[in-house]
């Protein structure tokens, strides 16, 4: 019996277990465990023993801590107690869910023979076991382990060296839906691309994992990044591996891919094969994404804007939660995908907007579509489980219900003059196999069990043989009732019962005090065969009861066999139509997203944005989509709408920059964020919270609004702010939108002012982007006199009887103060502190009037950044070219000295 113990925190590691000494001293069962564990490094081993999955040694320590389950011991190994813990097989999914959410990987090891078979090989033979599946965060398909509204991507990162710069590429697969995509990337945008796709698991060569340049990326990803042997990413064999998976001789029909993309795709496929053992999920053909096709949003911006989750990790309070009106799992995932990857192609964006506009104009049709969509199950995930032999009767029902709903939606749309996107969706629905829905409807019962092994999922009439077997089973129940009555009358024991359990099968049970008529005579003893005596009862059987039990057991076995054969036939019919089912499911998701965004637009009074290839950014009556809804829920009054116009001024080709000043609590940060969110919503193809909006395509969006310490990496708030600002100034183009809030506030006043001043100049002269720059450095407002595309804007306030009222309105002009002392008083600072602060402020303001910033600007030369950029654009110097051409490893010392003199001459 296992005892509760304090085993401590030490146990044999996997490497120590695998030694020859360890194996030699192990029991036969433990030797088997050690061998299987050695073949599955990096995974917790769920080792099946009867009705439990047991974990031993280091795995037991980790699992007991992670799951909060009791740590016990099972014997000793090499003189040390063997730590052990376990989970019941019937509840394994619940424990797997927790382990996977914590980033663990689990190897599921099952008994692949009956213990009776093992005994035939010898009394001490160990039951054969093998790993049937590796469960990892990126390769799960079980409904209980997946979030219906989130994709579950496995991603692979590959690098090919050669040429001036190494090639990097990403491939990502969701085996629960069959999505398979790939794209090239660069080290400078690698983290941004990974976070945009948001994989649950990233595999990469161990050589890249230990690359110092990319280490900061993997530090952010934590346990999501999993190093693998570099051979998995071999580009030479990549094309062949992918072709074999899809059963084709060449990838010519799939499109053109770079070597790095093929290496990443092949590694992802190989990892899927490795984790699924003998099964193959039905993946779609790999689709290539161009980096230029989506709006680039850097990691800091994505976090600051709280697109899918808040900074605390909650979905509530995010933009996605605020705009999600979808009613299907596929629709929710597609909406999230569009939000995280807004487009840069006006034609594709406007096609999405056309769908929303059409459904707004057809409210009755939109309502009927949504009513039908509410009954659509998650067909892609049901299909994947069926293809991987993990499906059940309810997955077949999901396919049947989805096909039925698709037919209803097609009927609703067929007579309408549809815009392009909805017309393509209709074609996808009409291409679904009509006969498959009929087959499933005529075969599946109305009430379905969870597991196919439970039987009872075929309706009466689906199989004549099954009907016959079921009749025998039902008839047997009546026969048993008759036998019970007969035996009671024959013995005179009115309390006699016929019962059943898994050990004895069917048996007759009477109380010990009433058993005499069944035991006193030899005739009675020969008729009622004694099976078991208990404290208060005795159990018997008869020849006819044993015969009946045999017939019932055979009938039940035969019934289940018939049902399982029918299940396999239905599954094969479904999997044969996998491509059309996935296309139809995608069409359902497109309709769901369009209908949901149409409802959102009507409900929240959003407008259709004008999106084109210009550099316009003109928002009238813009609102923050999340804050506005929160105010409405809390009855906090209407949201104050504001205009924002960063469009090129007359005669200028580049967009404008607004320098925004105003008090704390005046609404600056909300105004900054809402304009960034409006740009994202417009380019994802959604109506936006404004009365009108004209947005020229934004290629890159940067938002530095708020910052915090990064203690884990030894970076202060100011350092984090500077790193994020550097990324913006180095990467923003003339098509970018930049949102900056209070740059320079984390250091000394003059240092901060100087940095903010230089940053504004750089944005205006070098980046030439559209931007909003909020600041408390009022000295910066004088820059509008010299920078033609810079305009001052301020958050308006009203002073009344010594108090300040925040109007949350944006207007032209500059604030002359920040009202920080008034805010401090509202926050409850002691009156003496507030009074002293007023006195200090008065003295500082008097000193500032003697040296105003307007004098400073006349003394400072502007546009130096632009001059330096022009110098850089002239190309490398002769010295740089000569250095690049040198092969230093092949030079003699004399040749190196000559080369150095030659370089010195070139400098002259």
Curated annotation (Swiss-Prot):
Residues annotated for ATP binding in this entry: 662-669
**Its function?**
This protein is involved in the repair of mismatches in DNA. It is possible that it carries out the mismatch recognition step. This protein has a weak ATPase activity.
One GO CC term on file = cytosol
Q: What is this protein called?
A: DNA mismatch repair protein MutS
Which Gene3D superfamilies does this chain map to? Answer: 1.10.1420.10, 6.10.140.430, DNA repair protein MutS, domain I (3.40.1170.10), MutS, connector domain (3.30.420.110), P-loop containing nucleotide triphosphate hydrolases (3.40.50.300)
Is ATP-binding tagged as a keyword?
A: yes
Keywords attached to this entry:
ATP-binding, DNA damage, DNA repair, DNA-binding, Nucleotide-binding
